From Swiss-Prot:
<dbReference type="Pfam" id="PF00572">
    <property type="entry name" value="Ribosomal_L13"/>
</dbReference>
<dbReference type="InterPro" id="IPR005823">
    <property type="entry name" value="Ribosomal_uL13_bac-type"/>
</dbReference>
<protein>
    <recommendedName>
        <fullName>Large ribosomal subunit protein uL13</fullName>
    </recommendedName>
</protein>
<dbReference type="GO" id="GO:0003729">
    <property type="term" value="F:mRNA binding"/>
</dbReference>
<comment type="function">
    <text>This protein is one of the early assembly proteins of the 50S ribosomal subunit, although it is not seen to bind rRNA by itself. It is important during the early stages of 50S assembly.</text>
</comment>
<comment type="similarity">
    <text>Belongs to the universal ribosomal protein uL13 family.</text>
</comment>
<comment type="subunit">
    <text>Part of the 50S ribosomal subunit.</text>
</comment>
<dbReference type="GO" id="GO:0017148">
    <property type="term" value="P:negative regulation of translation"/>
</dbReference>
<dbReference type="GO" id="GO:0006412">
    <property type="term" value="P:translation"/>
</dbReference>
<dbReference type="InterPro" id="IPR036899">
    <property type="entry name" value="Ribosomal_uL13_sf"/>
</dbReference>
<dbReference type="InterPro" id="IPR005822">
    <property type="entry name" value="Ribosomal_uL13"/>
</dbReference>
<dbReference type="GO" id="GO:0003735">
    <property type="term" value="F:structural constituent of ribosome"/>
</dbReference>
<keyword id="KW-0689">Ribosomal protein</keyword>
<keyword id="KW-0687">Ribonucleoprotein</keyword>
<dbReference type="GO" id="GO:0022625">
    <property type="term" value="C:cytosolic large ribosomal subunit"/>
</dbReference>
Amino acid sequence: MKSYIAKPADVQRKWYLVDAEGKTLGRLATEIATVLRGKHKPTFTPHVDGGDFVVVVNAEKIVLSGKKLDQKYYRYHTGYVGGLKEISYRDMMDKKPEEVISHAVSGMLPKNKLRSRMMTRLRVFAGAEHTHAAQNPEVLNFK
């Protein structure tokens, strides 16, 4: 008996809705990354982009454990000499709460050519309202 290998044409995508209110950032990001990658499907194939769409709402109400609210920093470099910039988690949540979840999920996806395609299927919204009601997303509950 041969192993089944999914083809890109065979992939059927579903839409899922995740409420981030009161959830821990890392635990939620791992579950979202699993769905984006398609590992929850029995037809998972590593080299085929077979994941589903994920809509995350209430990104501004996500929590971190411990003192990370004050101690966690996001760092990036501008490319110029002395161009290392950093922004605290608290400031990031005030300015762009969607970026916090996107950054965490992106770090949990494989670092290859499929990553950007997987990230385009992640839609994050700061509040409870989202623009994908027409897709009838199925509510996805995590522990």
